[in-house]
Design a protein with these regions (language model features):
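Short polar/charged helix/loop
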Residues: 1-163
Length: 163
C-alpha cells in the first residue's frame, strides 16, 4: 500500500505568479507522492498571463488553477489539512497564521516578478522565477521520503538555497 501523499501549500502574496507556478509544477512533476495547492494572503483576481504562458509552453496543465486566498484553506467547510507550508514571499512569511494540524513550515524566498516595472524586466524576472521554481520542485521530488518531521524540515530548508 502506498503512503498517503504529502500535501504542500505554497503561500505567496497574491497567488498570481510564484505560488501558481510552484503549485502547477509540483502537480505536474510530483506524481502520487505530492498534492499541491497555492494561496495568497492578499489574493489577486487573476493569474499573471506570463505565468500561464510559461507553464503552457512546457506542457504543464493549467486547468483548475486560479488565485486563492489562504483563509479558504482553514476558514471554510472545505478546509484542507496540509503537511507542509512553503512561504515564497517575505509578506506571506510575516502574515502566515497558525495553521491547523501544525504543518512543517519553511521559507523559499523568490523575488516577485509582478514587481517589475517594465515589460523587459518583467519577462526576465518571470523566467528567473520559473527556473527557480522548477529547480526547487525537482529537488523536492528527488528527496527520499523522510522518516520524521525534523528530517522533512531539514530537507525542505536545504532546498531553499536552490536557484
Amino acid at each position: 500500500m502506498n503512503p498517503s501523499p504529502t500535501t504542500v501549500l505554497f503561500l505567496s502574496t497574491g497567488d498570481a505568479a510564484r505560488g501558481i507556478l510552484a503549485e502547477a509544477l509540483l502537480r505536474h512533476k510530483g506524481g502520487e507522492r505530492f498534492t499541491a495547492y497555492s494561496a495568497g494572503y492578499c489574493m489577486l483576481q487573476e493569474i499573471a498571463p506570463q505565468a500561464l504562458a510559461l507553464l503552457n509552453k512546457d506542457g504543464v496543465d493549467t486547468s483548475g488553477l486560479y488565485p486563492k486566498g489562504w483563509k479558504d484553506f482553514f476558514e471554510s467547510p472545505r478546509s484542507i489539512l496540509v503537511d507542509v507550508i512553503v512561504t515564497l514571499s517575505e509578506e506571506a512569511r510575516a502574515h502566515c497564521p497558525q495553521w491547523p494540524g501544525d504543518p512543517v513550515r519553511v521559507h523559499w524566498p523568490v523575488d516577485d516578478p509582478l514587481a517589475a516595472t517594465d515589460a523587459d524586466e518583467r519577462e526576465s524576472k518571470f523566467l528567473k522565477c520559473y527556473d527557480i521554481m522548477q529547480n526547487r520542485v525537482d529537488a523536492l521530488i528527488k528527496q527520499r521520503a523522510p522518516h520524521s518531521p525534523a528530517e522533512l524540515m531539514l530537507q525542505l530548508r536545504s532546498i531553499a538555497s536552490v536557484v
